[in-house]
Amino acid sequence: MANRERDRELLIPVADFGDKDDGSSSKPSSSSSASSSHQSGHETLSLFIRGWASKKFMTGCVILLPIAVTFYTTWWFIHFVDGFFSPIYALLGINIFGFGFLTSIAFIFLVGVFMSSWLGASVLNLGEWFIKRMPFVRHIYNASKQISTAISPDQNTQAFKEVAIIRHPRVGEYAFGFITSTVVLQNYPTEEELCCVYVPTNHLYIGDILLVNSNDVIRPNLSVREGIEIVVSGGMSMPQILSTLDKPLASIGNES
């Protein structure tokens, strides 16, 4: 009897249990793969939506930032200029916004007319004589005067005469600068005409002064104000095509 029961135990099909286990385990694996693919699809969609939203948000910032800065600067400037004469109108009982600003603009215009005369120039020279005797104030005045003279519409007193392009610092590289004056270098028995070119290195009031032969100076078709805008904007307002004012200098720019 014992041998028969042992033989029956050996004949028990063990593979059926394995098949049942495989079937039961395959169902969770297939469901887990489906859920993982569904989850990856959600992640891809969310990443796409977030990327699209961030891109459109940055586009809106790029468009609105210069507009906001322009309006804010203009509004601040109007309030700043209006503040010079608005207290006077307030004492007179006139509280209309803009009167101080219009009065300041008219005052600046009258100052320009007066300083263009002989009497105004004499008064200005006398005031500069007193300012230049002050230890610390004269340095501030000289620096601010040089910047204002650079954009002056008067060609006789303008610090920046012309916009210039020179080879600097190596052959094949060009630097953007301004011609401030000309000088004659006497190297006996010959003389060489040099242009004093101011090349800004940091903003507009810090730079290098280079003496360059007048034949090596390329003069583009840019005004001084356009050149200042190019320097202040870091070259972003540079036109795509530059042409020279005279043909002989154009050939210099085309050399290797």
Curated annotation (Swiss-Prot):
Ranges for region Disordered: 1-39
Stretches that traverse the bilayer: 61-81, 94-114
Extracellular topological domain residue ranges: 82-93
Disulfide bonds: none
GO CC terms of this entry: Golgi apparatus; Golgi cis cisterna; membrane
Pfam family, one: DUF502
Assigned keywords, A-Z: Membrane, Transmembrane, Transmembrane helix
Keyword Membrane: yes
Highest taxon listed in the record's lineage: Eukaryota
Biased composition range(s): Low complexity: 25-39
Tissue: Expressed at low levels in flowers, stems, roots and leaves.
Protein's cellular compartments: Membrane
Recorded family membership: Belongs to the plant COV1 protein family.
Name of the featured protein: Protein LIKE COV 1
Lineage of the organism: Eukaryota, Viridiplantae, Streptophyta, Embryophyta, Tracheophyta
Chain's gene name: LCV1
